[in-house]
């Protein structure tokens, strides 16, 4: 599944896991993307939307 929001364009954030011995390994934080059925220009369509866009009402379900 794509880790990008079709509404706001939010994508993954990158950083490091840091262990107790302070070794670093790269990792990524994916946004919480949900596949939502919404109406886009009069036709129902499925879009990938992050939960912050769904909560903010930017996606009409």
From Swiss-Prot:
Source organism superkingdom: Bacteria
Transmembrane segments: none
GO biological process: translation
GO molecular function term, any single one: structural constituent of ribosome
UniProt entry keywords in alphabetical sequence: Ribonucleoprotein, Ribosomal protein
One Gene Ontology cellular component annotation held by this UniProt entry: ribosome
Record-linked Pfam families: Ribosomal_L28
HAMAP family attached to this UniProt entry: Ribosomal_bL28
PANTHER family documented for this protein: 50S RIBOSOMAL PROTEIN L28, LARGE RIBOSOMAL SUBUNIT PROTEIN BL28A
Family, as annotated: Belongs to the bacterial ribosomal protein bL28 family.
Name of the molecule in the record: Large ribosomal subunit protein bL28A
Species per Swiss-Prot/TrEMBL record: Streptomyces coelicolor (strain ATCC BAA-471 / A3(2) / M145)
Taxonomic classification: Bacteria, Bacillati, Actinomycetota, Actinomycetes, Kitasatosporales
């Amino acid at each position: 599944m794509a880790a990008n929001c079709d509404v706001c364009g939010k994508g993954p954030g990158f950083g490091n896991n840091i262990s107790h011995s302070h070794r670093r390994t790269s990792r990524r934080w994916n946004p919480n993307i949900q596949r939502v059925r919404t109406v886009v220009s009069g036709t129902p369509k499925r879009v990938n939307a992050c939960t912050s866009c769904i909560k903010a009402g930017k996606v009409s379900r």
